[in-house]
Amino acid sequence: MITKQQVLEFLKNYDLENITIATICSHSSLQIFDGARKEGFRTLGICVGKPPKFYEAFPKAKPDEYLVVDSYADIMNKAEELRQKNTIIIPHGSVVAYLGTENFADMAVPTFGNRAVLEWESDRDKEREWLLGAGIHMPGKVDDPHDINGPVMVKYDGAKGGKGFFVAKTYEEFEELIDRTQKYTIQEFITGTRYYLHYFYSPIRNEGYTLSKGSLELLSMDRRVESNADEIFRLGSPRELVGAGIRPTYVVTGNMPLVARESLLPLIFSLGERVVEESLGLFGGMIGSFCLETVFTDTLEIKVFEISARIVAGTNLYISGSPYADLMEENLSTGRRIAREIKIAAQTGQLDKIIS
């Protein structure tokens, strides 16, 4: 991984009054470019081949310029060119997925957030250690598939967007569906309502919901629309579907807005606070936007089954603000909040606290 000291050396040559915000043209890039422009930054979209035509349909979110590469791996060879433009990369889910964790960790361009979180987020065992260490309630883990005696969710390491997940109720079903060439985790299947909670942690803001260092914000929340799980049961009962050779899949195709009962907000903030505080001790803290992927049970317990330590696509619902963000500032998206953090850090000489 590129060192923090190397990144700080790059920053010494930056014109901090002319920073460029860049990301790969995918995932939440429209929101990121829109938010950066609203905060006065120049924007750069990175794409393979011809720039996507759909950006022409959204002029407020179209990047000011494109960096066209032959492959995503070729981005590594463009580091000097990006640094000459005073670029700060905003990582989203596709950036890490397309570049790969090793390339992303080694990319010689200042990046928003703490890249050290990758080690803890991408390994499900370390992720579980982190969350349990924070006192978070998680679904039970099944170490031996022979011990499956009820519904479980099986996840392959690195599975994103709902791909690489399946549900099994018995060892026999598990054996029928498992790909043993991949590392996997078996979790208890929790019944309830899924909520994806979108937070923002600032190490440089010391007002609002303050922590031991910095402050925590709740910007929004969503629920994912999954194919074919959300519609499949129109065809019959689970037993009838299995008998017909049809099994649910969980590929994310979109997102739906949600709000939570106000009485649950103290617990929601407590979850975010504990996760951030634990991260400060483990790897110096995650920075910026993150998402706790949860299930709310009928006893109003919240169980966390995963964390995404960067902007998630569910925040795209709220480019013009959310019911929660509006109570802090109107028209505040997660993309704009990221740009605002960079802007304040640059103006106050604190970029070293939010980039890696």
UniProtKB/Swiss-Prot annotation:
The keyword Manganese applies. It comes from the Archaea. GO terms for molecular function: ATP binding; ligase activity, forming carbon-nitrogen bonds; magnesium ion binding. GO terms for biological process: 'de novo' IMP biosynthetic process. Its EC number is 6.3.4.23. Binds 1 Mg(2+) or Mn(2+) ion per subunit. Pathway: Purine metabolism; IMP biosynthesis via de novo pathway; 5-formamido-1-(5-phospho-D-ribosyl)imidazole-4-carboxamide from 5-amino-1-(5-phospho-D-ribosyl)imidazole-4-carboxamide (formate route): step 1/1. Pfam families: DUF1246, DUF1297. Mg(2+) binds at residues 293, 306. PROSITE patterns: ATP_GRASP (PS50975). Keywords: ATP-binding, Ligase, Magnesium, Manganese, Metal-binding, Nucleotide-binding, Purine biosynthesis. ATP binds at residues 145-196, 226. Residues 101-333 form the ATP-grasp domain. Catalyzes the ATP- and formate-dependent formylation of 5-aminoimidazole-4-carboxamide-1-beta-d-ribofuranosyl 5'-monophosphate (AICAR) to 5-formaminoimidazole-4-carboxamide-1-beta-d-ribofuranosyl 5'-monophosphate (FAICAR) in the absence of folates. HAMAP family: IMP_biosynth_PurP (MF_01163). Belongs to the phosphohexose mutase family. This is 5-formaminoimidazole-4-carboxamide-1-(beta)-D-ribofuranosyl 5'-monophosphate synthetase. It comes from Methanosarcina barkeri (strain Fusaro / DSM 804). The lineage of its organism: Archaea, Methanobacteriati, Methanobacteriota, Stenosarchaea group, Methanomicrobia.
